[in-house]
Structures are given as structure tokens and as C-alpha cells.
Design a protein with these regions (language model features):
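Mid-length scaffold segments of soluble, non-membrane domains
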Residues: 63-109
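Residue-level marker of positions within ordered structural domains that often coincide
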Residues: 6, 93, 154
Length: 165
């Protein structure tokens, strides 16, 4: 009986310790004026990112774990296209010279695995240019400088113009 209790106690402690482990890719909410993005922030860790870990020409969740979401508090022009206030799932299709940015109305997706099932809920597709930089960004970063959404990772930078109505 004592062995059974000891085994149960050790198993409980082990499971409890595992459940408190920190996520490998921490999550962050990037906040700008009237806009926020919730995303997992994976690290480069010496890997080739675009064209490697993240293949060209394939839908990508733009982060880690759950699909990235973007929330607009007011109606907006996103890369020159009108978008109603609300929360959307944010996907990209990266290519060497440009990215396709996708806003999708289906929330609660895990990664991009179900994208094909919900692509009929796409709100927007826009193409934006890619800029290669000398600056190495170790961890995927989304920020909101001066009327834009800036995506940086590895030596890649993508800027999406944002203008509120």
C-alpha cells in the first residue's frame, strides 16, 4: 500500500511539474493604436527560416502554436483595402520577393492545418514586398511603427500599411 501511495505521489508531482513548463515559443500581444496582434514568437535558433522551416508558396500561421489573430478596434485600410473593425486570423504566404497577407474570418484555428477547410472565410488577400536586411532578428517580431505593421524575422522584413478610417 505504501508503494502504491508513493508511486501515486511521484506521478502526481511529475505531471504537475510538466504542466508548468514554459512554452518554447512565448506568446505576445503586439499593440498599436487601435490594433493588436496575438501570436507565438518562435526563435531562429540557427535555422534557415523562409524557404526552409517556413516553405515558400505555402500558407503559414505567422507564428507558433495557435494561428495568429489580429484585432482592429475601428474600420481600417489594411494594405490599401477596407476592413471592418473586428478580430481576424492572420496568415501569410511567403515568397522570395513578396508575401500574400490573408485575413480570415474563422477564429480558433490551430496553425494553418485547417486553412483549406476555412479559406472560403477569407476577408482579404494582399501582396506586399519583402525587404532583405543586414540586421538579424532572432525571434519573430511584429510591431506597429508609424501607420504600418512591421513583421521581422531572420533577415526578412515585411511592412503592411495600416490606415484607420
Amino acid at each position: 500500500m505504501k508503494k502504491m501511495l508513493l508511486f501515486s505521489f511521484v506521478a502526481f508531482i511529475g505531471l504537475n511539474a510538466c504542466s508548468q513548463e514554459k512554452q518554447v515559443s512565448p506568446h505576445e500581444t503586439a499593440v498599436g493604436s487601435n490594433i493588436s496582434v496575438r501570436y507565438g514568437r518562435p526563435y531562429k535558433k540557427g535555422r534557415d527560416i523562409f524557404g526552409g522551416l517556413v516553405p515558400y508558396g505555402k500558407v503559414y500561421r505567422l507564428g507558433a502554436d495557435s494561428a495568429t489573430t489580429i484585432t482592429f478596434d475601428r474600420d481600417v485600410e489594411f494594405a490599401g483595402k477596407p476592413v471592418k473593425a473586428g478580430t481576424y486570423t492572420l496568415f501569410v504566404i511567403p515568397n522570395k520577393e513578396s508575401w500574400t497577407i490573408i485575413l480570415n474570418g474563422q477564429l480558433g484555428q490551430w496553425g494553418a492545418y485547417s486553412y483549406d477547410k476555412y479559406k472560403d472565410k477569407d476577408i482579404l488577400h494582399v501582396n506586399v514586398p519583402v525587404k532583405k536586411t543586414d540586421k538579424m532578428v532572432e525571434q519573430l517580431t511584429i510591431s506597429f511603427p508609424e501607420s504600418s505593421m512591421l513583421i521581422e524575422w531572420d533577415q526578412t522584413q515585411v511592412t503592411v500599411p495600416v490606415r484607420f478610417s
